[in-house]
Amino acid sequence: MRTSQYLFSTLKETPNDAQVVSHQLMLRAGMIRPMASGLYNWLPTGIRVLKKVEKVVREEMNKGGAIEVLMPVVQPAELWEESGRWDQYGPELLRFEDRGNRNFVLGPTHEEVITDLVRREVSSYKQLPLNLYQIQTKFRDEVRPRFGVMRSREFIMKDAYSFHTTQESLQATYDVMYQVYSNIFRRLGLDFRAVQADTGSIGGSASHEFQVLASSGEDDVVFSTESDFAANIELAEAIAIGERQAPTAEMCLVDTPNAKTIAELVEQFNLPIEKTVKTLIVKGADENQPLVALIIRGDHELNEIKAQKHPLVADPLEFADETEIKAKIGAGVGSLGAVNLNIPAIIDRTVALMSDFSCGANIDGKHYFNVNWVRDVAMPEVFDLRNVVEGDPSPDGKGTLQIKRGIEVGHIFQLGKKYSEAMKATVQGEDGKPLVMTMGCYGIGVTRVVASAIEQHHDDRGIIWPSDEIAPFTVAIVPMNMHKSEAVQKYAEELYRTLQSQGVDVIFDDRKERPGVMFADMELIGIPHMVVIGEKNLDNGEIEYKNRRTGEKEMISKDKLLSVLNEKLGNL
């Protein structure tokens, strides 16, 4: 490709509304342009990267035995009503009517469509297992699209769905897809972790997320320093260690009129924060117990996903409001505690090991100090309620936990029979009777993969693609002052034709621009290998080579350039 025949839309300045690095660089590199909130046009440089990511995904999915299909973006509402998600999904589901007043949605996902397709096409257990995938546009009406294509309303996703007669068959395909995903992200050159995850609105049982580690990520990824254990912070088990110490002081009631938060209590009374607890009031699952107290250590955070799995707690978790709390307990939020509490309480494992701690007295403006379980208040039910913190023991008993930010780029689920039962997707079993199919689903956010690669791999000059396979071009030819030097132009043209004939994805910068501008543009869009042709070096029989990823620069004999270049390209 010649730049003179290409839409080369780089920007010198960073747009003000771009918050994260990937958004900034995708705009500056001329990969995307905004059209409306959460909607983007993909320009030639961007679409080249996108198609190359799709190619890697497609190749690995095919190797894993999946079969490609293509389903409509527009989906009839009846399928969503049949699955039960028409009323469950929420405002992210964009609904509309056609001219015949029939309800449709723009698909945020395709479980309903694929289940309908397979129940029509597959009738016997002999046709299973079956794993179908597509690479297709999705639409989710995000309330606050942000971070460019990282969280946009329209995006491209690879979604696969498998169908089985047994749980064992599903597990086998799930294991294959786990490996396929690992292969995909390794080929793309991404530093990632596969972590245990919550199934969320998709539903099902087992689930893993594939998280690209990046400081701009929205998720906390937890992993062991000494083992393969990794989990989303929502699911990571918090292990409490040690034993509860004997009391050293008598419980006392203290006036604390200006201490309505843990931070204020600690500051005003010079208390160690790990000797305080906070009491959070949530809605109960049972109408006979409308409120439940959750008690965690003062410096810990409540894990809502864990908490809502307790049978006493409403799912989804919902905090009680101040009026409800005051009416039932008689005190405001800043004065709540375990002593003389008139609603059921659940305490975190770490809290169960505490002694001589401070908590609200359930009287406005008062706290109890030196509280001890058993002696001063009966031990409530103990449950894992908190987020893990760095340094906690790994749940598998090996090493301690580290926490990093991650960008979710893939998610695999064992759906079980959630959709197939609701939609009566059956096949004839070996015994001749109808058998409800067991399902799995497997998603990769293709557009998000592009952004996450940039988040993880960039410098102050621009993008550094982690793999040659996804760079918009593999080689850039930069002839300096070509339009003033016949020798430079001739050699550049010959090299361009030769590389093209070898199947190398090459961009030839034939613009009438200063060398500095040409270098800056090629570094900005992240071309891995740059060949710089200058008249003086050419006279000496040498060509300059620059590697974007390593920063390596070297002079190569003109006669050896092609062989050296092919070696660096891995004989591509």
UniProtKB/Swiss-Prot annotation:
Database matches in CDD domains: ProRS-INS, ProRS_anticodon_short, ProRS_core_prok
Key words, A-Z: Aminoacyl-tRNA synthetase, ATP-binding, Cytoplasm, Ligase, Nucleotide-binding, Protein biosynthesis
Primary localization: cytoplasm
InterPro entries reported in the protein's UniProt record: aa-tRNA-synt_IIb, aa-tRNA-synth_II, aa-tRNA-synth_II/BPL/LPL, Anticodon-bd, Anticodon-bd_dom_sf, Pro-tRNA-ligase_IIa, Pro-tRNA-synth_IIa_bac-type, Pro-tRNA-Synthase_IIa_type1
PROSITE patterns recorded: AA_TRNA_LIGASE_II
UniProt note: domains: Consists of three domains: the N-terminal catalytic domain, the editing domain and the C-terminal anticodon-binding domain.
Subunit structure: Homodimer.
The protein's name in its UniProt record: Proline--tRNA ligase
Organism, scientific name: Haemophilus influenzae (strain 86-028NP)
UniProt gene name: proS
